[in-house]
Structure formats: structure tokens, C-alpha cells
Amino acid sequence: MEEAAAAPISPWTMAATIQAMERKIESQAAHLLSLEGQTGMAEKKLADCEKTAVEFGNQLEGKWAVLGTLLQEYGLLQRRLENVENLLHNRNFWILRLPPGSKGESPKTTPSPSPRSSPRLNKGRSPATGAALTPRFQMFLWTPVQMQKLRPSRD
């Protein structure tokens, strides 16, 4: 049998095939450009996320430092509270209800009675007049040793 001879391709068919291939190539090129744009946007978003992560890390380090300081201060305040509780428990303190001096110094005056001699101190009232104390008056706790230092010497 004779092999079938290849049919000649008409120039019109060839031109149509080339045009179809050009359209397909143009479509693929447009899709490739779209993918390149999406890749660029994704890379930009990734860089922004990395920058934000670094900023959050720096802020977190600062917050950890502040938290550490707060925990140290809390420990100090806890010890001071325990000391005051011990003083109250042992009734080994004097209470003064005096405002601080104009320059922040402790006022020089005679101390209020101790809780041993006057167990019913009128809290929030002036010992002299009985009037309510204003918020600028503060409670100061003094041990008897500290009170001795406040008293003028009798030399």
C-alpha cells in the first residue's frame, strides 16, 4: 500500500494557526505579568510583615523590661507591707497625722499618742480639733527609735 501523501497546507491555514499561537502566547504573557505583579505584592507584604514583627519584638522587649521593673517594685512594696503589718501586729509604732512641710521635710512637732495609750484613735480626724483631715494630710508610721530622733535634745 502506498503511504498517504501529506496534504499540502494552505497559506490561509498556516496564517490562522500562527495567529492562534500568537493569541495563546499573548494570553500566557499577560498571565505571566499578572503573576509577576502578584509576586511583587506578596514580597512587599512579606517585607512589611517582617518589619512589623521587628517593631513588635522591640516593643515587647520594652514591655518585658517595664514588667521586670514592676515586679521588682512589687517585691519591695510587698516587703514594706509585711514590715508595716509586723509593726501593726506588734503595736510597735507611732502614728502622726501631719502634712509634709512646704519643702518636703518632715514636720517638727510632738508625736501623737501611741496606740497602746490610746487604742481608739479617731481615724481620718485631726487629733487637735476632731475635724476631718483633707487629702493633703497623710499618715506617717514612725517607730519609737525614729521618734527619739525627732525629739529635740534637752542639753
Curated annotation (Swiss-Prot):
Keywords: Coiled coil. Residues 98-132 are annotated as: Disordered. Residues 16-92 form a coiled coil. This is Protein ZNF767. It comes from Homo sapiens. The gene is ZNF767P.
